[in-house]
Amino acid sequence: MADEGDILTDLDLDPAAGGNEPPNGRDNQPQVGFLTQYIKDLSVENPNAPASLQWNEQPQVDLQMNIGANEAGEDVHEVELKLNAGAKAASGVLYAVELVYAGLVVVRNIPDEQAHAFLYAEAPRILFPFARTIIADATRDAGFQPLLLDPIDFNALYMQRLDEKRREEEAAGGGAATPSAGEA
């Protein structure tokens, strides 16, 4: 038997019975999660095939990345991970791959600064492995070695971007800017 003050007796297994119901039947608990993920845009160009498939030169690979988030409905945001990968050699362009991989994310009852961090750091971190696989498959299907992208530290990129923005605001304002809540 559990004693008074025991961890098991202190659990409120039926919060509705304790009068903790959300007002008007609305859930007021924080909620974050993906509804779905999808390829929004995919373009693969192999402009110099079939000659480029026989080039023995070491290509220069360029990767550009961008992250976007837009409101798609009440408490729903579309997060886009945009990746442009290209390979060039002295003989010409081997391939160009453009991918927009997106996800619909529910963000409910979360403070704005935490929601922003989730949409621009954590959600892209979750989407990236799927986008990485699509890029690798696309380059392989174009006749080249699969382009295996290294993991990306989206949290570090997010913090770096916040720091850059703060410095820009300080420079524009002539004084020290007060960081928003949640910025480090």
Where in this protein do the model-derived segments appear?
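N-terminal intrinsically disordered, cationic/polar leader segments
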Residues: A2-I126, R132-A184
